[in-house]
Amino acid sequence: MSKRRRKVLPKEPVRCEIETLSHDGRGIARADGKTQFVDGALPGETVMAKMVRTRSRFDELRTTEVLEAAPDRQQPPCEFADLCGGCSLQHMSADAQIRFKENTLREHFAHFGGIEPEQWVAPMRSPDSLGYRRKARLGVRYVKARESVLVGFREKRNSFLTDIDRCVVLDPRIGERIEPLRELLHGMAAFDRIAQVEVACGDDTAAMVFRNMDDLVPDDREKLIAFGQAHDLHIYLQPKGPDTVHRIWPESGGRDDERLTYRMDEFDLTMAFHPMDFTQVNAGINRNMVHRAVEWLDVQPGERVLDLFCGLGNFTLPLARKGGQVVGVEGDDAMVVRGRENARLNDLSNVEFHGADLHGDFTGQSWAKEGFDKILIDPPRSGAEEICKYLTAFGANRIVYVSCNPATLARDAGVMVRNGYRLVQAGVMDMFPHTTHVESIALFERSAD
């Protein structure tokens, strides 16, 4: 059987007239009856672009020259922006990025839910568009042909790692240490046996978790410790699964000691987390997001509040500070433990945490048989369609939905509206500047009978 012959791509760039943007931030043009998706192009622009992939119904191209620039174009703040997949919109002005995200949410509400909020709220802008990212997973790869180690994000639409020596969107405690990190790894005996580096930052401490596929020789451990000392970083190893993560610098006093923290001063809370725990990447947006969610729910003393997909208590504990009785439910048992730890740390007794598979049947659990006045829901990208069908049984008169996927928010909003709730307010939050990621928040209220 003969192999399918790969199509030969044109070597010369082609001229593209950009009409609009796709939801993944690429410019859309049309030629010879086919759609063209053009990386690095903006609506209204004329660009020259090189073909990188062709399909029967569309082509994928990369901008090589801008002939006529749009007013929304800006000089990317990062020299690696054209190639690195960590960001996709650095060539677009901040105002245009916000408009793009608002339009994406509007289109999804119309397409998937067939609804629109009674009021669009002003977008929540990130206090910082650079140096904001406190968590990331950095790939590590030894390139034999170059005899060097690369550390960073994948190239755009490619499995190769980008050759970078710094990152301007990462917290500077990490982003300014990419080159020293590369030098460290290149000098280790295990230079080709470190798969990735997880990075996490609290308010006062930054950490790196090295995924070592083999046991490290003593000299490599000493080099990692010296790196942590020199750059004021906590250093962890992960020889196998997540349960094997342990700190080697500073010396650990036990797993309870291996915590980073962030403050929420508005609520007089200190939140502790392990470097591998899920936390919001943008501290400024997180503070404003929690403030808005608490404000919208308007919890009164004595009210019962349910926080679904509660994690380590990022919303749960601020809600408890308002005097209600708060129940947090989470599918990850480790995060349930973390939520309880944080409640004790902050001396809160009007809150409880439960573990449950929120994508399965949880109706038999004791907490699910009780009524609630207010509900907060912050699901993963897959959303919470089945839960939304059940929410009316809790009897809540107000629900705040925090979303990291506009498509599933719109779908779930449609379910809630059909089950007797009004979509009162909604808006976007710029949790990830310079990317197409759309974080949003919506308020639902029970319709009058």
Curated annotation (Swiss-Prot):
Q: What is its EC number?
A: 2.1.1.190
GO terms under biological process? rRNA base methylation
Per UniProt, [4Fe-4S] cluster binds at 78, 84, 87, 167
Binding residues annotated for S-adenosyl-L-methionine, in chain numbering: 280, 309, 314, 330, 357, 378
Active-site residues annotated for this sequence: 404 (nucleophile)
Q: Which UniProt keywords apply?
A: 4Fe-4S, Iron, Iron-sulfur, Metal-binding, Methyltransferase, rRNA processing, S-adenosyl-L-methionine, Transferase
This enzyme catalyses: uridine(1939) in 23S rRNA + S-adenosyl-L-methionine = 5-methyluridine(1939) in 23S rRNA + S-adenosyl-L-homocysteine + H(+)
Among its keywords, does the record have 4Fe-4S?
Answer: yes
Provide the TRAM domain boundaries.
7-65
Q: Which InterPro entries match?
A: 23S_rRNA_MeTrfase_RlmD, MeTrfase_TrmA_AS, MeTrfase_TrmA_CS, NA-bd_OB-fold, SAM-dependent_MTases_sf, TRAM_dom, U5_MeTrfase_fam
One short Pfam name that applies is: TRAM
Q: Which family does it belong to?
A: Belongs to the class I-like SAM-binding methyltransferase superfamily. RNA M5U methyltransferase family. RlmD subfamily.
Note the PANTHER family from the entry. Answer: 23S RRNA (URACIL(1939)-C(5))-METHYLTRANSFERASE RLMD, RNA M5U METHYLTRANSFERASE
What does the record give as the function of this protein?
A: Catalyzes the formation of 5-methyl-uridine at position 1939 (m5U1939) in 23S rRNA.
Identify this protein by name.
23S rRNA (uracil(1939)-C(5))-methyltransferase RlmD
